[in-house]
């Protein structure tokens, strides 16, 4: 039976398609060559590597794949609307650094489990960058630890889940959280700020979050704090909630601020799954950056952050 190959459709544009050059670039992002024992979870950005690759690498380099048999990859949908978790139909996900084998049996098991999961077409899969941008990073670090070819992946596009669907999916996934042979990659950028994103929230007081949310409309920009500092404050409040509080608290933060964290549902799902599994480890953010420092309302930026557990 022929295998369905998910091609590296964003190679050559979002990241380098040359094996040697991509390897050299990813090596340049590494600070600490030794993974941390037992780290199995990472929140990782999904912009072009020239923008977010360094931040993403700070998380991936901590992952310990020595005992891992399977890596779940959660990513949001940028092109279609769905209320479900859509599982890849591919047999192989291609990268310039080597192929990643998909755990087809588990993908089929997820789809058959309940109404929370369904499968996505190969066209939908290949159009979505949030999953693909994790694949070369994953392949690089698996190869580095001598695990490429030994580990299978489970790519899942996470839709705009209702609370009921979120809980059902989390309960089912909790069994895989408990199993230490599983690792999880959660794909998400943080704040998308600017008129082109329809989001120009300005936070001038981090101590009074609900009262401090303003829509800034002048042509210029505030000076205390500067807009990029406000964006950072806004993101870091959310990051602190991910580190120390519950998935429900994170949901409330998003309702209050409307922060444009594109991977909000993948993040909520992994937090809820950890809670259902009574998993004690918490995410710790280790790197944060912005694509540019916004000072004027006419400017824009995207934030990138990575955390591990």
UniProtKB/Swiss-Prot annotation:
Pfam families on file: Memo (PF01875)
Superkingdom of source: Eukaryota
One of the record's GO cellular component terms: cytosol
Entry-linked PANTHER family: PROTEIN MEMO1 (PTHR11060:SF0)
Family, as annotated: Belongs to the MEMO1 family.
HAMAP family per UniProt: MEMO1 (MF_00055)
Protein name (database record): MEMO1 family protein C4H3.04c
Phylogenetic placement of the source organism: Eukaryota, Fungi, Dikarya, Ascomycota, Taphrinomycotina
């Amino acid at each position: 039976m022929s295998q369905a190959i998910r091609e590296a459709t964003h190679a050559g544009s979002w990241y380098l398609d040359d094996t040697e050059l991509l390897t050299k670039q990813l090596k340049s992002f590494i600070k600490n060559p030794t993974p941390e024992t037992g780290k199995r979870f990472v929140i990782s950005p999904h912009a072009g590597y020239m923008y977010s690759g360094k931040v993403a690498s700070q998380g991936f380099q901590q992952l310990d794949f020595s005992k891992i048999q399977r890596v779940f990859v959660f990513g949001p949908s940028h092109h279609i609307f769905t209320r479900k978790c859509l599982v890849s139909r591919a047999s192989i996900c291609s990268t310039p650094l080597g192929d990643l084998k998909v755990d087809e049996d588990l993908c089929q098991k997820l789809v058959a489990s309940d109404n929370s999961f369904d499968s996505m077409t190969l066209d939908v899969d290949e159009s979505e960058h949030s999953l693909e941008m994790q694949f070369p990073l994953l392949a690089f670090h698996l190869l580095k630890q001598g695990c490429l070819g030994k580990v299978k992946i489970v790519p899942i596009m996470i839709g705009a889940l209702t609370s009921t669907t979120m809980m059902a999916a989390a309960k089912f996934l909790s069994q895989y959280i408990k199993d230490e042979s599983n690792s999880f990659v959660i794909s998400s950028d943080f704040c998308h700020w600017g008129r082109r994103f329809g989001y120009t929230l300005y936070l001038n007081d981090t101590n009074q979050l609900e009262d401090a949310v303003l829509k800034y409309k002048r042509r210029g920009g505030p000076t205390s704090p500067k807009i990029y500092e406000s964006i950072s404050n806004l993101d870091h409040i959310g990051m602190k909630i991910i580190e120390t509080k519950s998935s429900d608290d994170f949901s409330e933060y998003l309702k209050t601020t409307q922060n444009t964290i594109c991977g909000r549902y993948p993040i909520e799902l992994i937090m809820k799954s950890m809670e259902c599994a009574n998993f004690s480890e918490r995410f710790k953010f280790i790197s944060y950056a912005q694509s540019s420092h916004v000072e004027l309302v006419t400017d824009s930026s995207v934030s990138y952050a990575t955390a591990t557990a």
